[in-house]
């Protein structure tokens, strides 16, 4: 059976959790391959809203094993707060497994994240301050602490001693902050060791053996394509690769075992934090999309920036990830609009760009070229086929499919798991 990847095709918050949850009852493993608790997603089950950060959306599917992959950076305190919160509401998290090779976020990573953002001033990236970037820096710099290290306190201590020699120099001499003690960091991590130990696995072997048994593995990328450290709007990006290729690296599942790559896009566009956003709306319409769509960050509560659908970005995302399918979410948010603009090209200094400009400077100065589509007023939350939609809504969906260059296989028409039009099976087809 296949390995399937779900990827955000914009700047995050597209509804990946809903897509994962929709498929979760039919898959055997749900994997989070990258990111940390800097990106949250919301899943609505039976009218009840669950806000997840570190845990894969599949944690709410009792028949699927949830796996936090090697590409994730884990704040253990945040992890167990999330687990305890779900269990207090009756959820079963006993099917969670964690890669031994995933890295751990230390208290000094969070401090460094926060003080470095303040140090950058106007050049700040707009991080969540949760230590994700500094943890990835230590991973690449070979100063990182991995999940498996809590199984051996002596190794953990050696690694922390090495890391703090550098971190304390930065904190004290550059940022005028206090130094961290080795003992306090060792005690912090060892305080989670007993709860972590039963969950720790060789996730590469676990997932590949599942595929050998013809079981279905679903990988849910965090963040999104345009937050990818290589392919995103650099430097306003995350510190990992939340594209389809990153799912392979962050899970240990080889690329030839991946048969479906599903891109998730809103029927409009949102972004959190700093960075270019050609179709951004600063007027009452932007506020309408924000309010109607509930566009506030799961982690921070920050209001999201809102704008129209960008077909140029959609085509580029399809290329980068090799999308086989698109899942359009929140079509219902557009209900009631008399006209819906879609960005079909850019103009930069009088020159038209039908595809993404090569440089970030040009993208930063891009002015959208719009094509307008007629809206609809009918309630679409009960639609379960494209034919159930008003004609103008059908035309809008077909236009997005044509402009993105990728088939649309599902459309979200409301907040609940069941508020979805499935055009074609996302597993069997």
Swiss-Prot record:
- Cofactor mode of binding and number, as noted: Binds 1 Mg(2+) ion per subunit.
Q: How does the record describe its quaternary structure?
A: Homodimer.
Compartments reported by the entry: Cytoplasm
What does the entry list as the binding residues for IMP? 13-16, 38-41, 128, 142, 223, 238, 302
Task: Please provide, alphabetically and separated by semicolons, the GO molecular function terms listed in this UniProt record.
Answer: adenylosuccinate synthase activity; GTP binding; magnesium ion binding
Extract the SUPFAM superfamilies matched here. P-loop containing nucleoside triphosphate hydrolases
| InterPro entries with a match to the protein in the record | Adenylosuccin_syn_GTP-bd, Adenylosuccin_syn_Lys_AS, Adenylosuccinate_synth_dom1, Adenylosuccinate_synth_dom2, Adenylosuccinate_synth_dom3, Adenylosuccinate_synthetase, P-loop_NTPase
What are the names of the required cofactors?
Mg(2+)
- HAMAP family on file: Adenylosucc_synth (MF_00011)
Species of provenance: Kocuria rhizophila (strain ATCC 9341 / DSM 348 / NBRC 103217 / DC2201)
Name the residues that bind Mg(2+).
Answer: 13, 40
What name appears for this protein in its UniProt entry?
Adenylosuccinate synthetase
Positions of GTP binding: 12-18, 40-42, 304, 330-332, 412-414
- Pathway(s) it belongs to: Purine metabolism; AMP biosynthesis via de novo pathway; AMP from IMP: step 1/2
Can you tell me which residues bind substrate? 298-304
Catalytic residues in the record: 13, 41
Superkingdom of this protein's organism: Bacteria
Q: Which PANTHER family match?
A: ADENYLOSUCCINATE SYNTHETASE (PTHR11846:SF0)
Q: Which Gene3D superfamilies match?
A: Adenylosuccinate Synthetase, subunit A, domain 1 (3.40.440.10), Adenylosuccinate Synthetase, subunit A, domain 2 (1.10.300.10), Adenylosuccinate Synthetase, subunit A, domain 3 (3.90.170.10)
Is Cytoplasm among this UniProt entry's keywords? yes
